[in-house]
């Protein structure tokens, strides 16, 4: 259909592709997929190297550029993201005898906390049973919800009483 035969059609009529033919599967998949954030890429590369190993600034720039960021246009954004991560304490500059002066590593406390959080999330997912579509909430959740409602009803009609005798003059 896409090829035009010279003898069959006039020069004035052109073949216009329909919407389904114009959008290929690769176009649709690239639109739906989004790039990860720069901070996520930086933290991921540092986490892959573990706590003891350090990563140079050039390696981080390469990792960010591989994910699809144009580093010639986004150097200011890269610097800003690095500075924010340093201010938050998620990463730190290496000042001891390890690596170059521009090398960075993941903060030990943050790395340990993230490992504990990941383990807790996995434990919760294992312990939770998937609910059926028509199933009601579990009993502990219902108790919490009902207690919240009762507290709201208790305090709904209560008026505030003035503290002490502010308005009374002796």
Curated annotation (Swiss-Prot):
Keyword annotations: Chromatin regulator, Chromosome, Developmental protein, Differentiation, DNA-binding, Nucleus, Phosphoprotein, Spermatogenesis, Transcription, Transcription regulation
UniProt GO molecular function: DNA binding
GO BP terms in the entry: cell differentiation; chromosome condensation; nucleosome assembly; spermatogenesis
Compartments where located: Nucleus; Chromosome
Disordered: annotated segments: 118-140
SUPFAM superfamilies: Winged helix' DNA-binding domain
Domain H15: from-to ranges: 34-108
GO cellular component: nucleosome; nucleus
InterPro entries associated with the record: Histone_H1/H5_H15, WH-like_DNA-bd_sf, WH_DNA-bd_sf
Modification type Phosphoserine: residues: 56
Pfam families membership: Linker_histone (PF00538)
Tissue expression remark: Expressed exclusively in the testis by haploid germ cells (at protein level).
Function field: DNA-binding protein that may be implicated in chromatin remodeling and/or transcriptional regulation during spermiogenesis, the process of spermatid maturation into spermatozoa.
Record family assignment: Belongs to the histone H1/H5 family.
Name of the molecule in the record: Histone H1.9
Organism of derivation: Mus musculus
Organism phylogeny: Eukaryota, Metazoa, Chordata, Craniata, Vertebrata
Underlying gene: H1-9
């Amino acid at each position: 259909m896409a090829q035009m035969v010279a003898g069959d059609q006039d020069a004035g009529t052109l073949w216009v592709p329909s919407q389904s033919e114009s959008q290929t599967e690769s176009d649709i998949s690239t639109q739906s997929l989004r790039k990860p954030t720069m901070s996520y890429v930086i933290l991921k590369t540092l986490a892959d190297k573990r706590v003891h190993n350090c990563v140079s600034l050039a390696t981080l720039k390469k990792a960010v550029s591989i994910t699809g960021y144009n580093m010639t246009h986004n150097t200011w954004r890269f610097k800003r993201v690095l500075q924010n991560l340093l201010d938050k304490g998620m990463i730190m500059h290496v000042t001891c005898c390890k690596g170059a002066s521009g090398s960075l590593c993941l903060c030990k406390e943050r790395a340990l906390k993230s490992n504990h959080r990941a383990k807790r999330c996995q434990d919760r997912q294992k312990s939770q049973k998937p609910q059926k579509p028509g199933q009601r909430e579990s009993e502990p959740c219902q108790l919490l919800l009902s207690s919240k409602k009762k507290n709201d009803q208790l305090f709904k009609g209560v008026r505030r009483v003035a503290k002490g005798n502010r308005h009374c003059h002796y």
